[in-house]
Amino acid sequence: MSSKTASTNNIAQARRTVQQLRLEASIERIKVSKASADLMSYCEEHARSDPLLIGIPTSENPFKDKKTCIIL
């Protein structure tokens, strides 16, 4: 009886594997050289609005302390 259960589990696992492989095979792929060129182009186009590159104006920074420490 346990061999029948093991066989059923193996078949179910094999079906899941085949389904996953079919899904992965259907994904459209592009060359790394094209993907990296597209990524660099996107970064260059959006660099002017990137706060990590241009910084956040002090007046708009919500994390800046409003007051200085009086104890020091």
From Swiss-Prot:
This protein's name: Guanine nucleotide-binding protein G(I)/G(S)/G(O) subunit gamma-12
Gene Ontology cellular component terms for the protein in this record: extracellular exosome; heterotrimeric G-protein complex; plasma membrane; synapse
Modified residues (N-acetylserine): S2
Annotated function: Guanine nucleotide-binding proteins (G proteins) are involved as a modulator or transducer in various transmembrane signaling systems. The beta and gamma chains are required for the GTPase activity, for replacement of GDP by GTP, and for G protein-effector interaction.
Main location: membrane
Any Pfam family matching the protein: G-gamma
Modified-residue entries (Phosphoserine), positions: S26, S49
GO biological process: G protein-coupled receptor signaling pathway; signal transduction
S-geranylgeranyl cysteine lipid modification positions: C69
Molecular function terms from GO: G-protein beta-subunit binding; PDZ domain binding
Matching Gene3D superfamilies: Transducin (heterotrimeric G protein), gamma chain (4.10.260.10)
Source taxonomy: Eukaryota, Metazoa, Chordata, Craniata, Vertebrata
InterPro entries registered for this protein in UniProt: G-protein_gamma-like_dom, GGL_sf, Gprotein-gamma
Subcellular localization(s) per the UniProt record: Cell membrane
Keyword list, A-Z: Acetylation, Cell membrane, Lipoprotein, Membrane, Methylation, Phosphoprotein, Prenylation, Transducer
Sites of Phosphotyrosine modification: Y42
Entry membrane topology: Lipid-anchor
Subunit: G proteins are composed of 3 units, alpha, beta and gamma.
Residues the record lists as Cysteine methyl ester modifications: C69
Propeptide residue span(s): 70-72
Domain of life: Eukaryota
UniProt record similarity statement: Belongs to the G protein gamma family.
